[in-house]
């Protein structure tokens, strides 16, 4: 394909930097801070304290962190009468040393429940166990966290329920009011953290995702009408480089949340390139384009205040698990840094997108 004079081929559009271009004032966190934004990633405590390159990268690039797994029930509750906060505490300690905020993830989800759950929790004791967990965990970190994902992934439009709620252990054991209970209990335990509902598959304008997005909106509207304390909605943003880019539907959703005085966080951003063909450079360019266009669209909305990726380096990504891996077996390039901790084209695309937000100094 012919390229205009002075233009770069598609594969080179975002391949314009080296490691020296990404630290200090050139880091993601520095660019975000100038624009009143938070930028960060999901982290693993063992790697923060056991892998120097990983820790250095996270410390340099992020001004907000979220635990990938360390704050989920399965990690925190080794036994019905025992809590284990070591991993979560380690993340907060790292963040404190590096001037970073922390998001809590999550207080209620239908997955990542401990092995003892099914044989212990019944309709008679579920509400007590549920509220005790939220009070204990949110209370331990009260006034220390930026926000909590209080309820995660509660909507499933294929459930057959008129309210669109996912069929989950919490719905079965407590009933649909479990969501209100979770948010009210979290607010009582921590009056300062921004209480968030978080979900996936609500970004695109397909019929399925449009319906789910409407389900989330109806859930949040109902909560507001009932006086349930909610401050934000998390849009997970597990996107695909081979799918149509999110557009008008998501933009209007974000704006409607803004009219409800709710913030929006991009909470788990990564770009799956398993179906993208071509060279590594071409695949990297396709991923970078999605980062640039998607984040630019999102941060153009004033109530979008944080962008977090689900990991920071391709060395550690869930998208290389067999269920999501490329058919050709090649590793995915889905995050801002490659497997060798070098900045990928996605890094520069993300940084450019953050720069598109009106600066605090303008």
Model-derived regions: residue spans:
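Substrate-binding cleft and catalytic face of glycoside hydrolase catalytic domains
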Residues: 22-24, 28-29, 64-78, 87-203, ...
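Glycoside hydrolase catalytic-domain groove-lining segments
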Residues: 93-101, 173-198, 209, 213-277, ...
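Acidic-and-aromatic substrate-binding clefts and catalytic sites of carbohydrate-active enzymes
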Residues: 19-21, 42-53, 73-86, 155-157, ...
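Aromatic- and carboxylate-lined catalytic core of secreted/periplasmic carbohydrate-active enzymes
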Residues: 286-310, 314-318, 333, 337-362
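Short, solvent-exposed turn/loop segments enriched in Gly/Ser/Thr/Pro and often Arg
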Residues: 43-46, 106-111, 149-154, 270, ...
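N-terminal export signals
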Residues: 1-16
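Boundary/entry segment of secreted carbohydrate-active catalytic domains
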Residues: 19-61, 68
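Short, acidic/polar
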Residues: 46-60, 128-137, 210-223, 290-297
